[in-house]
Amino acid sequence: LSWQTASAQAHANFNVDSLEYIMPNFSIGTVLFYNGERSQALLNINTFDNAVRFIDEKKDTLIVKNEEEIKAVYIKNRYFAKWQKKYVELLNPTNDTSVGIHRYINAIAKKNVVGAYGMASETASVSSLSHISDMGNTYKLKKGGAFDLSYHEVFYICKGSKIYPANTRNFQKIYPKLKEKISVFVKENDIDFSNLESIKMLYDYCIENQ
């Protein structure tokens, strides 16, 4: 099976600038609304607030006003389904099933511990910043403050318009005829549902044996 690149990154040392958006650049895309309407623009999806951004005629970057009415987004042949206020990318649609991935960054304010000579001694974190700049809005903490940033990828198994967290039970729900075989395959291959390559192995097995 042919898989799209999921842009998977190591969670421990990631580049905040490169992961602020799902796409590397704003690209022509289409927003599909629940009422059937479509809008086309230069689009991207922000990983901090999980909202669609677009660039208007004045080259300003804006948030889609009626975000709650979005059903799906297409950007450069990549499809993102809206599910529970998240954008889940369908990586490899095969018939009516697919593996999905949701990417996001958590930003948590933290307190610095004052060390020798009055210098801040930061507690361990994935990544630290003194401020976060988001489309012209800069969020700052008090003097000496910082953010703990962590990049996350959550995986799903999708069928039609249904999206389920990737786990043994939900794979069995999608492929009921393979229920026992899935249990054996997961155990024998030590399937890790927090790892995309591992999930792809199980998905490919199900597609080939359904």
Regions found by a protein language model. Give the residues of each.
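Short hydrophobic/aromatic-rich motifs at helix boundaries and adjacent loops
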Residues: 1-2, 23, 153-156
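Aromatic-patch recognition
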Residues: 39-163
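A short, solvent-exposed beta-edge/loop patch
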Residues: 139-206
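Short alpha-helical interface patches
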Residues: 22, 67-85, 168-180, 187
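Bacterial Sec-dependent N-terminal signal peptides
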Residues: 1-12, 202
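N-terminal secretory signal peptides
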Residues: 11-61
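Short acidic/polar alpha-helix capping motifs at helix-coil junctions
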Residues: 3, 15, 146-150
